[in-house]
């Protein structure tokens, strides 16, 4: 008998979600991490969510994950990004007190049944009969299991760079996972190197706050999770500084001392979170870049004396960092407590993975997070939840939970990764999704909680809350569809409608442009609805026609694309395929005709040949 059903290696955002999801399913789960006190640590920026990323947090929460609940407990500055645009692209974001976030994650894990947490560094994997069956720790301990989820973050043969000084580490002061990296290379997996970076941390009391523009949060903070009843922490106001022409001069004169531009780093960095060196070089015409000064914690809490200057991650030497910081408004006398640095690490080409996040060539081994080429807490957490759940389901003999691009941003991300791979760290944006109107942050629970209940990762408390909330939403939608007004009645309160004798429902009124508060006098019950319910009704009314059209498109695509492709399909045996198309299909190994349509560079002729061949097989 195995010691555990599932072993999760790594206690970062992916590992915590993986372990919790596996345990919620009922699998005997071990979370193995090199330091217990760093479980749930925010290694880089002290924030959760954002544009696209906030959708992922809501989706994690809809599947009863941890991140949204922890962010609500730790949040000290909430803001809904893209508020001036449509609800489909609204991006909930919260800055968090680092110490409170870490404590919240650890508390949530401690309350999770079926979960054991042990300290130890994984050194090797046990392979038997072509599948992974356990883990060997560097201290010699062995644990047997049915599946392993590997969430190594930046630790896989990690190297930290400050200028030309290199240190083997996955995070400042923490040793890398060298043996695991060597083990994966020995498996013959397609692998590469990526890099990410972090800015210097500044002493809070050394900043001249008085003359810096304020960046306040929302007056009414909006929680990530519907399970959160109140935001309890004091809310802070951030400030904004900026680089100057002098900052850019110092950076340009010292580019040769940067690890990135000095040739010490081979790995690609994230396009959408560039270092300050990259910004100055790539956008040479700009004389200034904003720097958001974000407190790392509330005063009096651990880290409360530190500030995160968002926007200036760097691998320049410490002396250059100090010189450039001093050229920014409000930071003339700022003290650097910890220098910024870049970290380079191994990743596995995500095309090595099935959509379940299990390795194609090695059953029993699942990968999640930065090891798959992504960047960001939210991307890691979402992958971790799916990998942990699917590992647990596999040990119980169940099929994996797979999400389509029309189901979730998580489905979009997994499809992008496993089908196309990456050439730089992958970050989620709303622009990556074809079905943005359907995949809103505000309806994540309606989209995914039923799937989570069916898959076994939603606990009874969350299921009961969802059932009650859905009944409330359904009742409000039904009443809004049944309540009608004559045109003259609507005109009397200021709505511009034709006097055509046709009665308008509340939904009709909400779908029109204009000031909808005038509706309060005609339907006071609507004004009395909880804000979350009222917004849902307004959004559904506003997008009704578009949503129906998008639903038709999704159903049509599903009917044409649902044909499954055999895992062992021999593409070299398909007549009519060019050698290039055979190579592309063989490398991508699409699991369905829908996935085959999205293989990079595929031609219509190749799709016709593939479809004809598969039909002859069936």
From Swiss-Prot:
Keywords: Cytoplasm, FAD, Flavoprotein, NAD, tRNA processing. It is found in: Cytoplasm. One of its GO terms (cellular component) is cytosol. One of its GO terms (molecular function) is flavin adenine dinucleotide binding. Its main location: cytoplasm. NAD(+) binds at residues 269-283. Its cofactor is FAD. FAD binds at residues 10-15. GO terms for biological process: tRNA methylation; tRNA wobble uridine modification. Pfam families: GIDA, GIDA_C_1st, SAM_GIDA_C. InterPro entries: FAD/NAD-bd_sf, GIDA_C_N, MnmG, MnmG-rel, MnmG-rel_CS, MnmG_C, MnmG_C_subdom, MnmG_C_subdom_sf. NAD-binding protein involved in the addition of a carboxymethylaminomethyl (cmnm) group at the wobble position (U34) of certain tRNAs, forming tRNA-cmnm(5)s(2)U34. Belongs to the MnmG family. Homodimer. Heterotetramer of two MnmE and two MnmG subunits. NCBIfam families: mnmG_gidA. This is tRNA uridine 5-carboxymethylaminomethyl modification enzyme MnmG. The gene is mnmG.
